[in-house]
Amino acid sequence: MPNFAGTWKMKSSENFDELLRALGVNAMLRKVAVAAASKPHVEIRQDGDQFYIKTSTTVRTTEINFQVGESFQEETVDGRKCRSLATWENENKIYCKQTLIEGEGPKTYWTRELVNDELILTFGADDVVCTRIYVRE
C-alpha cells in the first residue's frame, strides 16, 4: 500500500488558470486564486484506505476526510458542494469522481498518485486537466 502521509509542498503547476476558466470562474477571481494557490501546503494523514487531506493557501484552507470506496461530501476547486467517490485506479493512484449536489457544471474529478516519491495531483473539468506536482517537506 502506498504511503501518501506527510506534508507536501508544490514543485510545479500546469493549467490551473485554464481549469478555473473551464469551471466558469471570472478573470478577477482567477487572478486572486492563481496567486493564492501558488504555494499551497498539503498535509495528508493516512490509515490504510482512510484519508485526511488538509490544503492551506493564503486565502483558503480545505479539509477532507474520506474512506476509499465510500461516498463523501466535499467542494469542487471553485467551491461548489459535491458528492465524491474515491477509488483505487491502480496500486499508487486514487481517482475521485465528483457529482454536483445542486446546479449544473462540467464533469469534475481529481486524482492523487505517488510516483518516485512525488505526489502528482490532477484536477479535471470536462477535458481540461490541471497537473500539480508536490514533493515532501
Curated annotation (Swiss-Prot):
Compartmental location: Cytoplasm
Taxonomic superkingdom: Eukaryota
InterPro entries, A to Z: Calycin, Fatty_acid-bd, ILBP, Lipocln_cytosolic_FA-bd_dom
Gene3D superfamilies, per the entry: 2.40.128.20
Main location class: cytoplasm
Database matches in PANTHER family: FATTY ACID BINDING PROTEIN
Protein name: Cellular retinoic acid-binding protein 1
Organism: Pelodiscus sinensis (Chinese softshell turtle)
